[in-house]
């Protein structure tokens, strides 16, 4: 009973942290204390209704903190972070990435500008991603907070979604040739090993010097297969973390972000 209460308390605290980070990402506001409590309460309720602060995503935020923390990753302060989200699907995690990497690495530092690019072959999924992100922005607009990207602030986030083959990414103008973070959430190597070999090879090649590739997996065995394939392609698995708050899904042994791995390119 005490354990359940502790877990409930941890998730509630995690939701508060996530709401505060999302406020920062979309409006550029600083600490939560700068906003009236009634505004924060309204935002929390709206974000909960949208599904953006459900338990699965609170656990995902905490998993990012743990996995990247273990490899000594430190966000810049007042800098820029480029993120490529491959096979992003409807990309419910898009706002999470923006909020996470936008947080300053130091106590006195300013917010980071996050340039995030989501890519998926499936055009319908990309349209869902665009609508979802726009709907989340509308929540903050409805709460009376001006959106950071609509201001002249240089820290405004840039978020774009593309329906195309990732290997043709370099054909788009204004997109970096390499990224600080290349992310694949819920990789699916079981679906088509040859196709995923190509995706992993491209992902590793798109990592900037000193950057990271991060993957999460639904299944234990599939995660191990993915890591072996990444190693064969020249990746170094720096850390692999089991998610202690993973949310069970629709098949035995399947759960959201069951494992997370942080990978570097071998020198």
Regions flagged by a language model, labelled:
Residues 90-111:
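Conserved SAM-binding loop of SAM-dependent methyltransferases across substrates and taxa
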Residues 171-182:
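A short acidic, Gly/Pro-enriched loop at the edge of an enzyme's catalytic core
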Residues 210-218:
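Conserved beta-strand signature within the Rossmann-like core of class I S-adenosyl-L-methionine
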Residues 8-76:
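Class I SAM-dependent methyltransferase Rossmann-like catalytic core
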Residues 122:
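Conserved SAM/SAH-binding beta-strand->alpha-helix loop
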Residues 180-194:
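A short SAM/SAH-binding and catalytic strip from SAM-dependent methyltransferases
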């Amino acid at each position: 009973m005490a354990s359940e209460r502790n877990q409930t308390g941890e998730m509630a605290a995690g939701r508060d942290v996530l709401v505060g980070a999302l406020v920062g990402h979309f409006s550029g506001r600083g600490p939560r204390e700068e906003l009236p409590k009634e505004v924060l309460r309204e935002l929390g309720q709206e974000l909960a209704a949208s599904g953006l602060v459900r338990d699965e995503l609170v656990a995902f935020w905490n998993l990012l903190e743990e996995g990247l923390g273990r490899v000594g990753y430190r966000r810049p302060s007042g800098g820029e972070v480029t993120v490529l989200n491959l096979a992003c699907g409807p990309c419910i995690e898009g706002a999470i990435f923006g909020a996470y990497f936008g947080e300053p690495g130091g106590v006195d530092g300013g917010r980071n500008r996050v340039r995030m690019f989501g890519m998926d072959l499936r055009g319908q999924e990309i349209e869902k991603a665009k609508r979802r992100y726009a709907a989340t922005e509308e929540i903050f607009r409805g709460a009376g907070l001006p959106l950071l990207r609509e201001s002249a602030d240089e820290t405004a986030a840039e978020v774009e979604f593309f329906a195309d083959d990732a290997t043709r990414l370099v054909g788009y103008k204004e997109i970096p040739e390499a990224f600080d973070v290349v992310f694949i959430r819920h990789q699916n190597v079981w679906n088509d090993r040859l196709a995923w070999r190509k995706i992993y090879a491209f992902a590793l090649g798109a990592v900037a010097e000193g950057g990271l590739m991060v993957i999460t997996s639904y299944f234990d065995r599939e995660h191990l297969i993915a890591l072996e394939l990444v190693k064969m392609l020249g990746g170094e698995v720096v850390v692999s973390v089991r998610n202690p708050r993973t949310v069970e899904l629709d098949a035995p042994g399947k759960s959201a972000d069951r494992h997370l791995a942080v990978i570097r390119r071998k020198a």
